[in-house]
């Protein structure tokens, strides 16, 4: 069952305010995945590591000169169909939220699962993302 929209609005807004496009439907996901160039998809979540590390780390990394052509998010536990459709694009990767996936021309080139977000700080995660942006974007 999805979370209350009132509960998660601040969690959505934290990314949207940084320019991240929300993918609310399977069609939104499919349209994004057809785009050429580099794409970062954030699997957003209500958990503490999303609040303390993932969202702040993404926001910090997006200030880098080099960044993906497209940046979007799905919200696990809320936008169930969109999240399932996104996960169908990475079938060999177990579901993980929060998580981050970087694609280049539709091919997954970098993935950060929850266990590589937990226990870190936002600066460390941002540094990892900036390294990937510098390499692939």
PLM regions and their residue ranges:
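Structural signal for conserved beta-strand scaffold positions within catalytic alpha/beta enzyme cores
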Residues: 24, 73-75, 102
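Short helix-loop-beta junction
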Residues: 7, 11-14, 59-68
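Conserved strand-to-helix beginnings and helix N-cap segments that scaffold or border functional pockets
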Residues: 51-56, 83-84, 122-123
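Short acidic (Asp/Glu) patches
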Residues: 83-97
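Non-catalytic, surface beta->alpha helical segment in thiol-disulfide oxidoreductase systems
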Residues: 94-137
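Local sequence-structure signature of Cys/Sec-based thiol-disulfide redox active-site neighborhoods
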Residues: 31-65
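N-terminal leader/targeting and pre-domain segments
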Residues: 1-37, 136-137
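Thiol-based oxidoreductase modules, predominantly thioredoxin-like and allied folds used
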Residues: 43, 66-85
